[in-house]
Structure formats: structure tokens, C-alpha cells
Design a protein with these regions (language model features):
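Chalcogenol-based redox active-site neighborhoods
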Residues: 1-155
Length: 155
């Protein structure tokens, strides 16, 4: 698994932005601190609450969510689910799970990515990583606390 101190891998994938435009999303699109989070599938019941929670981080960092579902699925889900209709960050299609495979966060039995969160600095170096089981949601407030501590620096 790619971890703390390593560079986050470059990606060029399709996604849906906060205005529901579909297009190419790359690592270069994100400046400064970044929170990249991965979730198993669109149209599930845990994921919308996590996505809505992660949206509160957009004032602190660039935020982007990833799953293996395609961009058309993401757009349909955004339009269908009130919790994520108005999010202010992109959802990206890691079709084929190439990025998830490179990060080594794929559950081989289920064929989906784990619930992983990466906090990445302005130099694209991973400063924090956490990976949860498929059925265990994340706490966006804890991600925010970790992000703020990392941005503050020092011990």
C-alpha cells in the first residue's frame, strides 16, 4: 500500500464536478492540500452520508471522491440523492480500479475499493492515510481534525 511520505500517483480519469459537468479530472487539477477519499460503490446507503460529510472540508482543502462506477452513474446518483445533489467537490470514476489498484486498496473478493482516505500536501506527498472495511463508515470531523493538525505542522 502506498503510504505516508510517498507521492500520490498521477491520475487522469473521468468525473463529475460540482456543477454536474462531466470531463477529465487529473491530479494536476488540485492545488494545495488535498483530501482524496475512496468509497465502494455509488447508490449505496453509507456512501452519501460520507460524501456529504467530506463536503464540509472544501474550505480547508481540495476534496475529491473516487469509486469504480462510471461518470454517468455518478451523475445519475447525484441527481437522485438529496444528500449529495449540491456537493461542492468532484466525484471521479476509477473505472477498472486502476488508481485503486496502484494504491493497493482494492478488496479482491468484492471487486471494489475499500473506504480509504488520503490527505495529500501541496507537493503531492501523502501525509495521512486511513483505510476502513467496506461496511465501516468514516467520520469527516476526524478527517478535518487530522487535516488541520497536519496543516499547522510541528509536534
Amino acid at each position: 500500500m502506498i503510504g505516508v511520505g510517498e507521492e500520490f500517483p498521477y491520475f487522469e480519469l473521468q468525473g463529475v464536478d460540482c456543477e454536474n459537468n462531466m470531463g477529465t479530472v487529473t491530479l494536476s487539477d488540485f492545488a494545495g492540500w488535498k483530501v482524496f477519499y475512496f468509497y465502494p460503490k455509488d447508490f449505496t446507503f453509507i456512501c452519501p452520508t460520507e460524501i456529504a460529510g467530506m463536503d464540509m472540508l472544501v474550505s480547508e482543502a481540495s476534496v475529491c471522491g473516487f469509486s469504480g462506477d462510471n461518470e454517468f452513474c455518478k451523475l445519475a446518483w447525484k441527481k437522485d440523492n438529496e444528500l449529495i445533489q449540491d456537493i461542492k467537490h468532484s466525484l471521479v470514476a476509477d473505472c477498472g480500479l486502476s488508481l485503486s489498484e496502484e494504491l493497493d486498496i482494492v478488496n479482491k473478493i468484492e471487486g471494489v475499493c475499500y473506504r480509504a482516505t488520503y490527505i495529500v500536501d501541496g507537493g503531492n506527498v501523502i501525509q495521512h492515510v486511513s483505510v476502513n472495511a467496506l461496511d465501516t463508515g468514516r467520520n469527516a470531523n476526524e478527517v478535518l481534525r487530522t487535516l488541520q493538525a497536519l496543516k499547522a505542522g510541528g509536534l
